[in-house]
Amino acid sequence: MKTYWNKGAKQKKKVIFFIIILLGLLFFLRDDYQPALLFVRKYIFIILVCFIMLFLGVRNFRKSASTGKRLGILFIVTLFFGALYFVCFHYHMYDYMKTYNVYNNLNRFEIVELPLTQNERIQPLRNIFSMANESVGETKDVSLPHLVRVDGSNQWTMAIQPTEKYVWQGIKDNTEEVFSVSSTTPFPRFSNENRIPVTFSIGESLKFSRNTYNAVVQRLNPWMLFNYEPSDTYYMKNDKGAWVQVVSLIKWKGFFFPYPSFGGVMVVDNGAHTFSDYLERVTIGKGTYISPEEMKNYEFLTKQNTLSEKVSRLQAESLKFLGGFSDPLPWNMKSAVKIPVAPKDQNAQPYVTDFDFSDTKIGAYSGLYHWFGLEPIGDERTSLSYSVFIPADGTNQLYYYDHASKKEGYAGVSAMPLKVKESKKEYDWSSNTPVEFRPYIKIIAGRKRMFFLGTVSTISNSNPEQFDGSATPDLALVDSEYRDVVWINAKKPSTWNEEIYKQLNEAWRSSEHINIYFEKENTVLEKNRQILDSIQLLSAQQKKVRDIQGLQRQIDSIKMDK
């Protein structure tokens, strides 16, 4: 390069022009090469070890004069890289160490009392997704629903955006509507009042600079390009009542076996596509970065669902190290746990659930959490080992309840589908299946009791991701302790606890010697009615006695005449 530079002015101009073009490409194409930067960041320790080993091997190879030594060096280098691959990737030791780093950096807190659930959602995520897609036209797609807090209530929100099937629409069209559907209603409606007209110039299905991922990456500074990556996109209202896109960010931490953590959010305001908007997107990107420490200053981001599920899953999975570093290894596994995967259930844990921590006295907020039900690591074991509660707003805290050490003997999520199917054998379970068993914790008959709430859905034979749930689905509550199944009315959530008690009170009373509950106090009118009925019954009985006595006298007189 130096020789070429010194040849003359023409060559210097070419070099300068080439450097300008290269810098321009590096600046404008940040979103294209950022995955490569993240790859280096995630595996930087392994890459450095490989580079050092390769450097030493090549240097010694060049210094060696004999063929035998060179063959020996080649053998050692090959053996090293082969062993590195098998240990780190084939046997997943790299992921093992990454998860252990997550565990060591977790702010864990064991709770001694389960929180109550509130604002139970009726429909599972995949049902909502299918019903939303049934409500849009050929040229529109619906983004994956997320449960968020909007105007003080829990809502399923998703964008109505140009379909990915037609590229031209993804280039020129905006995202112009958002679905916002109540999660607590048994019959969600996707009509006009739940279709919010709001325009975003970027979207998850749009192309090039108008894609949400690309626009957010362009907003990252050079340091963040190496350490942050966009994740899930949520739609909610900000503190001014305007609809915004909130993109959850993942931050990679650590040098030895880097691990993902919550990195804050990027908030993208609504607005139509304009030329100035285009210039902003391709140069500095879109969005306002809010760090985890600053999120407490924004009310709409507190007690909210903004945490990437990729991060929360790894945090929950890391609890397998509660028994020590070596406990999850194949020859131990005394307390190792896993996140269960239910067959045919497309929505894997976590289940975003609204919890009330007010009576636990641990200082945790009441609101949306990512809930996990961890089970023993063996496939044949389905007991509930831990309930894990991770604040959905990214608060640096993890709460867990240890069912196993308390020897409660609760059944886990994996055991629920078969129990529901066994309770109603007349169902066509070949096309229907109970899905998404989320926790239902209430005070019934004098103490907290844990159930799992499942919804029966019909899954398409041709497309396993297409769920068809009725507007008023069949719901089943399974007692995690007694294993009994209670079928409840989706339209009357206020009666669920009483329905549970009516079915299970005999078992509870015989086992726990509890008092009688749900006994209704009679009103004055009902008491007067009972008295009147008693008087009428007594009068009828007296009349019958007089009739019998009259008949007896007639019989006696007939006998005397004879």
Regions found by a protein language model. Give the residues of each.
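Soluble extracytoplasmic regions of secretory-pathway and membrane proteins
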Residues: 3-562
